[in-house]
Amino acid sequence: MSYIVELLTAALCLVLLIASLSLQRYKEKLSLFTGICLFIILIVSLFSEALLNGSQSQSLFGGAYINDSFSTFFKQLFLIAAVLTVLISRDHLVSKQGEFYALIVSALLGMMIMVSSGELIAIYIGLELMTISFCVLIAYKGDDKSKEASLKYLILSAMSSAIFLYGLSLIYGITQTTAIKEIAEALVTGQIAPLEILGMIFLIAGFAFKIAIVPFHMWAPDIYEGAPTSITVFLAVASKTAGLAVLLRLFMTGMSSASSYWIDLIIVLSVITLVLGNLVAIPQTNIKRLLAYSSISQAGYFLLGIIANSSLGIASILLYSLFYLFANMGAFGVVIAVSKATGNDQIKDYAYLAKRSPFLAAVMLISLLSLAGIPPLAGFIGKFYLFLSIIEKGQIWLAFLSIGMSVISVYYYLKVVKVMYFGESPTKLESIPVSISTKLALTISMTVLVILGIYPSQVVNVVLSVSKAFLS
């Protein structure tokens, strides 16, 4: 029963769809039901055979679907993100509809399929399931902004899927297979043709959209601003890490022997993503757009682990993914609470937040400083291992550039902190109410960022063992 996590997730999706149609009176209870079910699935995943047995992996359909410690780690990451998303969504008007939660679980299932796929067609199926679910979720508010954001996401997603499929067809045309393991064998034994290199470039471009890597980032600011904020954070965290997981499996195992052909492209993408993401974030006055460009710059840091092309590089991506999840959940959770109270997402609306809600201000402070990589918070540990991995690779200049961009990011993060603690006091100081479910999600996020920043050794050991098992 090593695939029980996926089966339970699919069953939950069906139950939610049926319940939303037949149990109209209990629609508002579905958020609690969904949260509890997702938490139970997370507990089941924590005790799953693949993670407990370290390097042991199992496969279905001739290796098309793989369950190993690598995929299990990311599934747990997605489940945590889904649980926290449900918690912070409970007070939203859009969350009163049962299908809202069915779509979240549907997107979650698509991500699980993506990270466990050992075959390009299976990856595409998971990718489309996730994308279609997000297209509907982004438009869920029903206003003009969310509809526009959904349409943009739909059109650009279709383009990225077409690019991915074209790359897939080129790889298949040369290697006569879509199985990642067989592609790896074909690349090792044969001479790499120009069309294969072109296919690799198209595959990278297809997933660069999902991760919001420059120049495939154009959708992120508008969609982050227009979508319901709880969906924005789920998209920013889970969708990004799902794309990263696929890139890792595809290029670190399937195409590692051809790394000399694609690694320079990844370096270029990382540099322009780091520079543009951080510089364009500086003048932003809308908090969601600022966090969108912050998310774009974070994608550049993630690419450092792929550039390292080593066990430490993979481990650093796993580690940073975990910390990135909680930092974004904390920041966007505060955005939801403040936006609900003020009706705006402007940074100026956070004036004197420390007086209006000390709890929200503290969560935002810790989340932003963690994203900036300030010790002793968890984000510092994640960035430390990312920088260490590329230094071991000999890319000293890239490490210094990344550190410099981190210093720049401190400026625009502290701009928000300054407004919260020292901004011009509004004429009327009104306290901002925070629901129990939102407070629980924010407390979990803040606690994890602090504790794992001070005591990271246990988590570091886990990701190192997962990365070694993945490469073996």
Swiss-Prot record:
Keyword Isomerase: no
TM ranges: 3-23, 32-52, 69-89, 98-118, 120-140, 154-174, 197-217, 228-248, 262-282, 295-315, 317-337, 361-381, 394-414, 440-460
GO molecular function: NADH dehydrogenase (ubiquinone) activity; NADH:ubiquinone reductase (non-electrogenic) activity; quinone binding
The entry's keywords: Cell membrane, Membrane, NAD, Quinone, Translocase, Transmembrane, Transmembrane helix, Transport
A single BP term in Gene Ontology: ATP synthesis coupled electron transport
Broad class of the protein's primary localization: membrane
Functional description taken from the UniProt entry: NDH-1 shuttles electrons from NADH, via FMN and iron-sulfur (Fe-S) centers, to quinones in the respiratory chain. The immediate electron acceptor for the enzyme in this species is believed to be a menaquinone. Couples the redox reaction to proton translocation (for every two electrons transferred, four hydrogen ions are translocated across the cytoplasmic membrane), and thus conserves the redox energy in a proton gradient.
UniProt-listed NCBIfam families: NDH_I_N (TIGR01770)
Protein name: NADH-quinone oxidoreductase subunit N
Species whose genome carries this gene: Clostridium beijerinckii (strain ATCC 51743 / NCIMB 8052)
Gene coding for it: nuoN
